Amino acid sequence: MEANKTTEGPQDTQDAKEQPSLEDTNAEDLYEATTHETPLQPSSSQKHFQPPEIHLETPASLNPDTKGAEGLQDSSVSGTPPVKSSSSGLLSLPPQLSPQSVTSLEKAIAEIPLEEFGYDSPISKVKEEPLQLSPTANIPEYGSPISEVQKESLEVSPTANIPEYGSPISEVQKEPLEVSSTANIPKYESPVSEVQKEPLEVSPTASIPESSHELTSDKVPQTQVPESEHFPKHSFSESPTQAKEDESTKEGEAGEDELAVGTSKIPAAKPGLRAKKKKEKRAGGVTSRPVVPAKRAELVEMAKAVHREQFDDQVNNLFQWEKDSTLKAIQTGIYIGWRCPHYLWDCFRIGDESKCFCGHLLREHQIISDLSVPCSVSQCRCLMFCFIPSRPEEVGEFWLKKRATFDPKAWRAQCRCKHTHEEHAATGAHPCRHRGCFCPSFESNFLCVACDRRWEEHETFFETGDTRRKGKRPYGANNIKNWHRTY
């Protein structure tokens, strides 16, 4: 045995020379792994050790697995069986280390967790969520290990088929409903335990495959319905037969209303119209209706608005001057009128109470001829009578007399320069005589109530019966009959 030990000495020395290098590399690898992966806080027993001596010597002396692995590696390299070297004493613990510290160090090293990176980890859970499909969308086919999809042939019809889902969780009731075009979407207020399937109205081009899926979740897939489509509004307690009966009763009531009127579907006449027709009918077939002017009904309303007791007096006062002037013209044979030159009828007939532009009445003028009617008032330069309205009714301002502070005698016709006709010159173009006013001629701020033309467009005419007959204007007795005729 001693010979064997002596003969094996050189090899052991070589192995011992090579072994420290391997041990050093293994120890460095372990040190790097422990320092990078999980940093440890040294215990109280470990503080007495020197770091290089601990990490280099303890793995070789404490771990028998590393020794066996190194022996196998040496034997494979040298081709000789592993031999226990005599230089193991060099790797022995120093005398100052106690066995308790060694055991605590072993426990600390053994408790170091090493993180293993698993790249081939299987996917734990795959969430299955229903897809919202449009009627014209193409559904791709996927082969998944979770559920088996049964492929069935598609039957395209004007009313699309509805997918039937076989669910192990909830039982689905199949109930065919006839949905009308004016249906409303049902409202569900209770938790859904049993889902009723209702047919959807889909366009003829849409086709949905029928397939059965084993659902892992409690959710039931829903399809999006266009907003234009509405479904009947009913609760779960109501059956589809009740909805049909309600629709049939509504249609029956509508049909009875139409039959009551007649087959022509004409709405029934109102009772008020029938009562009016009965009043109009009398014995003998004679009908009577109130006579109301259709085109000028506002005249009747205006006449009703006027006080009935004073209506005759107001009308007589308004047209009394016309009557007096007409009768006097027939007696004297001189017809005095105020009109536009091309008119065949006079806008106003001039009488003794008519006022001239100079501010004096017609009776204060002297009629010499049809072209010379001067004023007889002293210091008046008027050479020809020129009619101007002296009452507000003659210019269409009827409402002025209703004012409490209105004085009819103080009313005067005004120019557009806001001065009266008496403040203008009586001859020529009638310029304004007011101090500081540069109005060259009188321009009325009113219109004629008979023809809606301005005062300066009218003229005053003195004519005989022969002149009016030649001009085809009314004269004599015709003057009384035609004085109210329009132009």
From Swiss-Prot:
Region Disordered, residue ranges: 1-103, 132-289
Keyword Phosphoprotein belongs to the record: yes
Skewed-composition ranges (Basic and acidic residues): 227-236, 243-253
Biased segments, Low complexity type: 81-103
UniProt keyword Phosphoprotein, yes or no: yes
Modified residues (Phosphoserine): 248
Pfam entry (one): FAM221
Bias type Polar residues, positions: 1-13, 36-48
Highest taxon of the lineage: Eukaryota
Alphabetical keyword list: Phosphoprotein
Family listed: Belongs to the FAM221 family.
Protein name stated in the entry: Protein FAM221B
Origin species: Mus musculus (Mouse)
